């Protein structure tokens, strides 16, 4: 009998099911992992060998290993901590204790991104102008006006669980160990920017610094502020019909992530279409009786100074953007495939920093985070992988306060005192010039003091005669709760764990996850206001108490789906589900209906899901990242009919479009792209102009514009024009396109309308220098993961 046991055990080992785990994983982070530039390298933008060593991978759609325990050089910065850096400089940190592990993460991140950490803490505390000059004063004002005081941040940090606070302290201590190291006289590891900007000595890192970065990311990256004020101005200029045409409450034919067969998730349960019609009339009447001219003049002045939306400079350091992701379920083999490409632009260094962690509490964890935040934002452990895209739902509202005095206002029939304080901002002319950070010298050194106020609704953003605009945030004071949910996500072992974690996050980042059992899911979490039923959510509300929120949407009612019958999910910042409304349009592209850019992903992912594999899933980005997303879905019959009808050079324009496959990246021997590229870009612009002409010039703000990450995407106005205009308009647009391109290229021959392929100018968060990247509509960082047995 005893001799039988070894045989039985051996047989059991052979017949046991394979261990569920990460089977394959790869990623790319262009231009590179590091942001370190030496003192000697400031002039040339050089330093670490890992500043730009992933550009070649990205440009050729190649990837580096994203699995655990890659070989590399080992460093032991202190007892209990080891750091192994692979051939691309990505650190894998192992700690004898959880404290040791997170100390090591802080130490390694500081090695790679110490000056970026400095920029992040200054941006989020309103202190950029102290080192970068007076051109950042407006951004510093926004950071202090719309966010929190030091005591408020400290109070929020005191509320997070003790184990997470301990992790933050370990991360802080690791950063400070590196600061102490580089602060030694003559140390060659000191980043050159600190010397060039005379930003010495380096202040110790604090838990408050980490808290401020976490607050900013949770509040701003998922959605940012709303468009109520531009919407109100557009409504006044073009009238109700034009406004409703370009910014409906719901867009017909919109593409959603949760399949309609899997459920409907109303953003405002209990609100009827009749309520919405009454609310639209009521809000228009309120705005007609309210003089916002002096308030809007103030807003316009700030916009002119910042060169864009208020806070544009702040978001250049900590940006907001779009992103894409998908997951495919292989039920037959109990496998799942996930791909994610968060799109936040490209800079040197990137917003994201990559690392791997091994600790007693978290044996295997790998992915990216923002420098300064002690968790893996996006990545995988050995059982679950996950990705994010910006949710872009409307989680804040603008209130028009009835001002009764310099710092008083009326609310619910009573005069109330604003909560006001003085904030002093120091600024100085920087001693050196980094073009991507310091565009002009601005005013010489000095200081200014600003009065910052809040009402019952929130921060007062603009004031005028008799009115003030205050913004109410659903997430106010609760941003750091997201850290709890993301930590649970880091620890998740099954999709059910991800589902539970999503009940704790307060930010509006879409999540798609996959696990080693082959399960997948999608969530659109966050704190979503239940708005007043009979007021228009697209426009400012009266602040006198008539239009208060009814509460928050229950977490169980937010859009989500697990293992949809179709076997896949995908999101490219499109609406999450049926029943969801457009809000004030924090992202205009959400209004583009059936021509939203996600359509190409839905088509490609559905095809790959018929025969699921890691290779098929990973190849999707080669097509979606090089194709003008809407072009494959344009009505080609309408193009042919328009060609027969067109005159002048119109037929040649339409022939060029019909001959093109939508690829904007393939070049000829001269480095130029297909004539269809310039033709398509001009044609849809001309179509939009035809659509907007009878509406009025002010309609342009509602039509929107494409962002740097989506250069070949379409605007809301172009989408509406392509979907609704007829053959005659197509023919007119083609003729206008021919005239424009003939003048631009000096020839009416469409075959000569070839332009150089577009490049993406890599920004800088410091002195680093990077070559431009070939433009693809791809992620700042991309990961592909296969899980199963």
Regions found by a protein language model. Give the residues of each.
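Terminal end segments
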Residues: 47, 51-54, 582-647, 728-789
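Sec/Tat signal peptide C-region and signal peptidase I cleavage site
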Residues: 16-20
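Compact, glycine/acidic-enriched structural inserts
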Residues: 120-122, 361-441, 486-489
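Hydrophobic alpha-helical segments
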Residues: 461, 469, 507-608, 679-691, ...
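Alpha/propeptide regions of enzymes that mature by internal proteolysis
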Residues: 482-504, 601
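Second-shell loop/turn segments in exported
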Residues: 101-105, 150-166, 470-473, 484-489, ...
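Substrate-recognition/specificity elements adjacent to catalytic centers across diverse enzyme folds
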Residues: 21-337, 342-348, 360-362, 367, ...
């Amino acid at each position: 009998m005893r001799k039988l046991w070894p045989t039985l055990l051996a047989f059991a080992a052979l017949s046991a099911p394979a261990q569920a785990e990460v089977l394959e994983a790869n990623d790319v982070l262009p231009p590179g992992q590091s942001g370190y530039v030496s003192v000697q390298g400031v002039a040339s933008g050089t330093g670490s060998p890992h500043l730009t060593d992933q550009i070649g991978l990205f440009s050729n759609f190649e990837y580096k290993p994203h699995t655990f325990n890659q070989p590399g050089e080992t460093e032991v910065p202190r007892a209990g901590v080891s750091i192994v850096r692979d051939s691309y400089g990505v650190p894998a940190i192992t700690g004898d204790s959880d404290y040791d592990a997170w100390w090591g993460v802080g130490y390694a991140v500081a090695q790679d991104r110490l000056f970026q950490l400095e920029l992040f803490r200054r941006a989020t505390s309103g202190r950029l102008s102290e080192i970068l000059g007076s051109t950042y004063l407006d951004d510093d004002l926004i950071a202090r006006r719309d966010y929190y005081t030091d005591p408020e941040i400290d109070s929020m940090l005191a509320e997070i669980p003790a184990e997470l606070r301990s992790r933050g302290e370990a991360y802080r201590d690791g950063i400070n160990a590196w600061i102490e190291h580089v602060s030694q006289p003559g140390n060659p590891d000191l980043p050159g920017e600190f010397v060039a900007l005379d930003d010495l000595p380096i202040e110790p890192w604090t838990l408050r610094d980490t808290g401020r970065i976490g607050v900013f990311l949770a509040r701003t990256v998922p959605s940012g502020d709303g468009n109520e004020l531009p919407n109100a101005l557009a409504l006044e200029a073009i009238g109700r019909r034009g406004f409703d045409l370009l910014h409906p409450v719901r867009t017909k034919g919109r593409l959603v992530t949760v399949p309609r067969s899997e459920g409907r998730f109303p953003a405002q349960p209990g609100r009827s279409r009749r309520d919405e019609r009454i609310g639209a009339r009521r809000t228009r009447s309120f705005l007609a009786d309210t003089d916002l001219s002096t308030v809007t003049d103030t807003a316009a002045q700030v916009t002119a100074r910042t060169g864009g939306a208020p806070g544009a400079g702040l978001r250049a350091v900590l940006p907001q953007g779009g992103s894409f992701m998908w997951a495919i379920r292989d039920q037959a083999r109990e496998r799942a495939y996930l791909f994610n490409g968060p799109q936040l632009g490209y800079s040197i260094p990137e917003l994201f920093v990559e690392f791997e962690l091994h600790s007693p509490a978290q044996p295997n964890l790998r992915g990216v985070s923002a420098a300064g935040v002690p968790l893996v934002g996006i990545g995988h452990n050995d059982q679950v992988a996950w990705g994010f895209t910006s949710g872009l739902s409307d989680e804040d509202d603008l209130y028009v306060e009835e001002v009764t005095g310099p710092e008083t206002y009326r609310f619910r029939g009573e005069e109330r005192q604003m909560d006001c304080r003085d904030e002093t901002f120091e600024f100085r002319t920087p001693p050196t010039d980094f073009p991507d950070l310091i565009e002009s010298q601005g005013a010489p050194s000095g200081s200014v003091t600003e009065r910052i106020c809040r009402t019952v609704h929130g921060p007062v953003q603009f004031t005028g005669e008799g009115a003030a605009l205050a913004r109410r945030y659903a997430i106010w004071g609760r941003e750091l709760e997201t850290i709890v949910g993301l930590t649970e996500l880091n620890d998740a072992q099954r999709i059910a764990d991800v589902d539970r974690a999503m009940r704790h996050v307060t930010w509006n980042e879409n999540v798609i996850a996959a696990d080693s059992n082959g399960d997948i899911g999608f969530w659109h979490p966050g704190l979503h206001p239940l708005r007043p039923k009979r007021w228009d959510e697209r426009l400012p509300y009266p602040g006198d108490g008539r239009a208060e929120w009814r509460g928050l949407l229950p977490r169980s009612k937010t859009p989500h789906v697990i293992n949809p019958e179709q076997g896949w999910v995908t999101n490219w910042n499109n609406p999450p589900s049926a029943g969801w409304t457009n809000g004030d349009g924090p992202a205009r592209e959400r209004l583009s209906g059936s021509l939203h850019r996600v359509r190409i992903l839905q088509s490609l992912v559905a095809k790959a899901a018929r025969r699921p594999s890691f290779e098929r899933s990973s190849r999707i980005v080669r097509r979606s990242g090089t194709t003008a997303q809407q072009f494959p879905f344009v009505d080609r019959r309408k193009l042919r009919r328009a060609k027969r009808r067109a005159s002048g050079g119109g037929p040649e324009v339409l022939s060029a479009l019909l001959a093109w496959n939508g690829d904007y990246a393939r070049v000829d021997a001269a480095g130029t792209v297909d004539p269809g590229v310039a033709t398509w870009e001009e044609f849809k612009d001309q179509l939009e102009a035809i659509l907007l002409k009878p509406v009025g010039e002010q309609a342009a703000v509602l039509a929107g514009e494409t962002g740097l990450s989506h250069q070949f995407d379409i605007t809301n106005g172009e989408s509406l024009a392509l979907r609704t205009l007829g053959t005659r308009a197509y023919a007119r647009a083609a003729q206008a396109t021919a005239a424009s391109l003939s003048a631009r290229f000096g020839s009416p021959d469409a075959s000569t309308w070839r332009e150089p392929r577009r490049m993406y100018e890599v920004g800088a968060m410091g002195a680093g220098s990077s070559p431009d990247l070939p433009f693809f509509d791809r992620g700042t960082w991309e990961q592909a993961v296969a899980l199963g047995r």
